[in-house]
Amino acid sequence: MLRTTRLWTTRMPTVSKLFLRNSSGNALNKNKLPFLYSSQGPQAVRYTSQHEWIAVHQDKTAFVGITKYATDALGDATYVELPEVGTEIAQGESLGSIESVKSASEIYQPADGTVEEINTNLEENPGVVNEDPMGDGWLVKMKLGEGVNVEQVEGLMSLEQYEKTLVHDD
């Protein structure tokens, strides 16, 4: 029995690879505002190679945040800087930044749009980004730019595509 156990454990993937393959951590939290904003849930959820996510609803309202993978790499958030409501931000431009005990990281806009609301809860409690990055830790609510179709925006990935990039990064 002991020998069988040893053989079994040597075949197990590392913890990080096992987590990435099972990866419910990078999926949108279905019990929180970014999902519940509309009764049907988001029309599309997409990810960037810089570890941001965007959840787009039927009315072209979108929520933007960072992934669980990003928060794990960043460490405990101590400060979140976000743009003012009404700010127009083009895809790839800085949306703000998150400072942590380890470093500071820029957050980039996944698609053209105008900021409609910021998550003011993060001003007093930036750790929510770590606790629930795919739900209560959303950063901004925005209106997509005219003619933007998130499914056709270059560089955005499905959850499956995004997680494949994470496995290759390790």
Swiss-Prot record:
PTM annotation (N6-lipoyllysine): residues: K102
Span of domain Lipoyl-binding: 61-143
NCBIfam families per the UniProt record, alphabetical: gcvH (TIGR00527), PRK01202.1 (NF002270)
PROSITE patterns: BIOTINYL_LIPOYL (PS50968), LIPOYL (PS00189)
One Pfam family per UniProt: GCV_H
Native source species: Saccharomyces cerevisiae (strain ATCC 204508 / S288c)
Segment annotated as transit peptide: 1-47
Needed cofactors: (R)-lipoate
Cofactor binding note: Binds 1 lipoyl cofactor covalently.
Induction: Induced by glycine and repressed by the C1 metabolic end products.
Name by which UniProt lists this protein: Glycine cleavage system H protein, mitochondrial
Keyword Signal: no
Keywords (A to Z) from UniProt: Lipoyl, Mitochondrion, Transit peptide
A GO biological-process term: glycine catabolic process
HAMAP family: GcvH
Cellular localization per UniProt: Mitochondrion
More about this protein: Present with 3510 molecules/cell in log phase SD medium.
